[in-house]
């Protein structure tokens, strides 16, 4: 099985429970066909570089998976038919880092930064 990172951009109107449900649907496809979810990260609500379907912001989700071509086709079909997902991208990787992704590290640094301008 090959390693992939799947990045999803999801509509901003979705609640956290709806996002969890969407993620569970995708992970169940992976596990039903003997794939493996290696890592899951929710990157939060982020601004888009440009409007996509009238959306300025969206939820970002990253799934790192071990999967074969059959699983990839099932996931692509599920994603294609799901109106909640604005964009998706499968990226083939050689290995999956177990550390926190740089996006989440930057997010946590921004939250802990002290505002010295006031």
Swiss-Prot record:
GO BP term, example: translation
Keyword annotations of the record: Ribonucleoprotein, Ribosomal protein, RNA-binding, rRNA-binding
InterPro entries: Ribosomal_bS6, Ribosomal_bS6_sf, Ribosomal_S6_plastid/chlpt, Transl_elong_EF1B/ribsomal_bS6
Pfam families with a match to the protein in the record: Ribosomal_S6
Superkingdom in the source lineage: Bacteria
Molecular function in Gene Ontology: small ribosomal subunit rRNA binding; structural constituent of ribosome
One GO CC term, this protein: cytosolic small ribosomal subunit
Keyword Ion transport: no
HAMAP family: Ribosomal_bS6
Role this protein plays: Binds together with bS18 to 16S ribosomal RNA.
Family membership: Belongs to the bacterial ribosomal protein bS6 family.
Stored PANTHER family: MITOCHONDRIAL 28S RIBOSOMAL PROTEIN S6, SMALL RIBOSOMAL SUBUNIT PROTEIN BS6M
Protein name as catalogued: Small ribosomal subunit protein bS6
Source organism of the structure: Orientia tsutsugamushi (strain Ikeda)
Gene encoding the protein: rpsF
């Amino acid at each position: 099985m090959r390693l992939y990172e799947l990045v999803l951009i999801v509509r901003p109107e979705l609640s956290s429970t709806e996002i969890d449900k969407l993620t569970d649907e995708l992970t169940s496809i992976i596990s039903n066909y003997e794939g493996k979810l290696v890592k899951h990260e929710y990157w939060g609500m982020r601004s888009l570089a440009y409007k996509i379907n009238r959306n300025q912001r969206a939820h970002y989700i990253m799934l790192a998976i071990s999967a074969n071509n059959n699983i990839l086709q099932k996931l692509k079909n599920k994603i294609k038919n799901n109106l909640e997902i604005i964009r998706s991208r499968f990226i083939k990787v050689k290995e999956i880092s177990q550390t926190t992704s740089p996006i989440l590290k930057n997010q946590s640094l921004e939250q802990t930064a002290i505002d010295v301008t006031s």
